């Protein structure tokens, strides 16, 4: 039966129409409000930027007549030379601020909170947010003042005083003072804070005291890296982090945190408290930045892409601007015109690139492992065909390593011969250690009949690691040694390191022109949280490291490091695998990308100001 349209239906439809109109008007009003808020925020940001520019002009001693410009005609004073290269870039005819710089990490970052993070990835982010007293010229390697405007060193080398610049502020607008520098050391050294690695690194400092604009670092004894240690210490704001020292409970709150990150650097977190593992790592330009030149990019972003193939796809699709290629990829990509037309390749040995290694754990769950025997460790090195890894997996873009020291510098012992692949020698050493094939099943066993079998733990998602470990599995079995690959996600791997819960592990250490191996080889660093996670203890090595560390004269120090190198070469606590070339592509819209003595001039390293930029006509991202 057909229903007639009645009066009450008209009333109902009219009521519904009124509701819809009200909703539409409300949405329109909300949209206008959001637009107003966005405009207001833009004005606030612009005013904050102008104030920061005015502050920079005042610091330069400029006469404030006429409009403020990023690059004026002033000559940089000596105490602002850290910004000389960035200042030169800002004077280029096509220079412009804006756009985003997007990179990627091959693993998920577990925490961005200072002192709690022990991985390279979190450090890369922190360097853009947290300032240091000094920085370094990437071409000359000369130390330059940054937050400090000058320094003085006592004749005995035990006291270093830095004078902090006037008028500096953190990204929340609060002033940065010498007291914040002193607080940063006291915060880190407080036993309530879970920072054993950093406490070990800064253990030579006996006190840090502020007096006006001066802050003085006092050392217990001479140490060759004293100036670098003091000058590169992260400067934390006391007003933000100080509350976490109030009690054990507040310290535990800090220790459990993942995203407490606030500083005075050229970039800042959108929120300095809310970041969690799995979130996009996104920094925005610090509009209150005090430096001579402000940050060129509007945003600095890192994506977590844990599969190599996915990283390459993201790079080819333009989703990331800087891509570190695997050797096989690089060989093919540099011949791909579609890639090179949009991205510029760079190939170089980064002095800070460090080395890849296999570390042999000597004590697990309170019991000695087979790797507690030096002969077993040496046998494993003979079974590791490192030249084949370099040739077949790394396509020749690497050097075989025979120790922790940079072979391009003075610290490496030039008289040490790199062990070559030798199955017969490995079998002989294993037999000396009591491992022979007792039941003729092709596997060597101990005197108790226990097969020599273990797992190698390594980061999952990396094809290079996977290929290396699978090759080693085939090589080791030639001597009757059974190895099982154990790929794990980065947070799981960090937990295994902290708990010393692994048989063997393959990772990398960053390097430098001269490094200190106290952190990962001294017996004292086997404590929980220390970086001697393989439980290797050698009093002879401890003494050599200590002697080298306290020798201030480089000509006398290098022979001591050569002795350290010789002992590590003999003991083989690690099997040092290789030092890779950096094989990097950067989007061609990014200008002023160069290879310097310190590597690619990406900025951030040693808190160096960013020198890259994108001309306005080539920018692809906006706010």
Q: How should each PLM-predicted stretch be described?
A:
Residues 124, 131-142, 234-294, 299, ...:
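Gly/Pro-rich hinge or "lid" segments in bacterial periplasmic/extracellular proteins
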Residues 94, 163, 198-247:
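Surface-exposed binding/hinge segments that line
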Residues 188, 207, 270-282, 303-367, ...:
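Extracellular/periplasmic solute-recognition and catalytic clefts
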Residues 85-87, 99-155, 186, 262-266:
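N-terminal lobe/hinge region of extracytoplasmic solute-binding protein
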Residues 43-50, 149-194, 213-218, 311-314, ...:
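Aromatic- and charge-enriched surface segment that lines or borders ligand/interaction sites
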Residues 107-123, 147, 174, 226-236, ...:
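A structural "hinge/loop" feature
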Residues 15-24, 60-72, 77, 81-85, ...:
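Detector for C-terminal structural segments
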Residues 255-256, 287-334, 474, 482-484, ...:
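Ligand-site clamp/hinge motif
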């Amino acid at each position: 039966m057909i229903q007639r349209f009645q009066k009450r239906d008209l009333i109902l439809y009219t009521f519904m129409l009124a509701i819809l109109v009200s909703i539409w008007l409300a949405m329109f009003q909300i949209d206008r409000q959001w637009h107003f808020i966005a405009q207001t925020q833009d004005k606030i940001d612009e005013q904050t930027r102008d104030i920061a520019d005015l502050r920079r002009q005042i610091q330069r001693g400029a006469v404030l007549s006429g409009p403020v410009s990023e690059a004026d005609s002033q000559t940089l004073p000596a105490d602002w030379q850290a910004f000389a290269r960035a200042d030169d870039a800002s004077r280029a005819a096509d220079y412009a601020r804006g756009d985003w710089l997007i990179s990627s990490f091959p693993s998920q970052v577990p925490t961005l909170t200072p002192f709690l993070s022990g991985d390279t990835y979190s450090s890369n982010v922190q360097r853009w947010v947290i300032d240091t007293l000094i920085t370094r010229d990437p071409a000359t390697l000369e130390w330059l003042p940054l937050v400090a405007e000058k320094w003085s060193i006592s004749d005995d080398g035990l006291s270093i005083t830095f004078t902090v610049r006037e008028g500096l502020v953190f990204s929340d607008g609060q002033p940065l003072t010498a007291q914040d520098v002193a607080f940063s050391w006291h915060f880190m050294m407080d036993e309530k804070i879970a920072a054993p690695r950093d406490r070990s690194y800064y253990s030579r400092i006996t006190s840090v005291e502020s007096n006006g604009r001066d802050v003085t670092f006092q050392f217990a004894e001479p140490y060759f890296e004293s100036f670098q240690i003091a000058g590169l210490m992260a400067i934390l704001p006391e007003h933000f982090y100080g509350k976490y020292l109030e009690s054990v409970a507040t310290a535990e709150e800090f220790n459990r945190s993942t995203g407490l990150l606030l500083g005075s650097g050229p970039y800042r977190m959108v929120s300095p408290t809310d970041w969690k593992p799995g979130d996009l790592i996104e920094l925005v330009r610090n509009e209150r930045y005090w430096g001579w030149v402000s940050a060129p990019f509007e945003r600095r972003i890192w994506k977590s892409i844990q599969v190599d193939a996915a990283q390459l796809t993201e790079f080819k699709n333009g989703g990331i601007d800087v891509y570190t290629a695997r050797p096989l990829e690089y060989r093919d990509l540099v011949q791909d015109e579609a890639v090179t037309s949009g991205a510029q390749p760079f190939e170089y040995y980064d002095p800070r690139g460090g080395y890849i290694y296999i570390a042999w754990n000597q004590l697990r769950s309170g019991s000695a492992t087979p790797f507690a025997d030096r002969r077993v460790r040496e046998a494993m090195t003979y079974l590791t065909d490192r030249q084949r890894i370099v040739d077949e997996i790394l396509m020749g873009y690497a050097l075989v390593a025979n120790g922790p020291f940079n072979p391009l510098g003075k610290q490496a012992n030039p008289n040490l011969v790199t062990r070559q692949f030798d199955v017969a020698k490995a079998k002989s050493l294993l037999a000396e250690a009591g491992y022979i094939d007792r039941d003729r099943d092709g596997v060597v066993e101990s005197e108790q009949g226990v097969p020599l079998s273990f797992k190698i733990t390594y980061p999952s998602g990396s094809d290079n690691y996977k290929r290396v470990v699978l090759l080693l599995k085939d090589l080791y079995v030639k001597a009757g040694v059974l190895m099982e690959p154990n790929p794990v996600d980065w947070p799981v791997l960090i937990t295994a390191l902290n708990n010393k819960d692994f048989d063997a592990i393959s990772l990398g250490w960053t390097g430098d022109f001269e490094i200190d191996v106290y952190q990962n080889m001294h017996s004292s660093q086997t404590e929980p949280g220390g970086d001697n996670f393989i439980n290797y203890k050698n009093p002879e090595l401890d003494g050599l490291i200590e002697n080298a560390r306290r020798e201030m004269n480089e000509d006398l120090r290098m022979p001591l490091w050569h002795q350290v190198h010789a002992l590590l070469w003999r003991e083989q606590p690690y099997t040092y695998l290789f030092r890779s070339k950096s094989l990097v592509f950067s989007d061609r819209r990014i200008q002023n990308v160069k290879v310097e003595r310190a590597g690619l001039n990406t900025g951030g390293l040693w808190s160096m100001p960013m020198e890259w930029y994108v001309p306005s006509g080539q920018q692809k991202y906006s706010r």
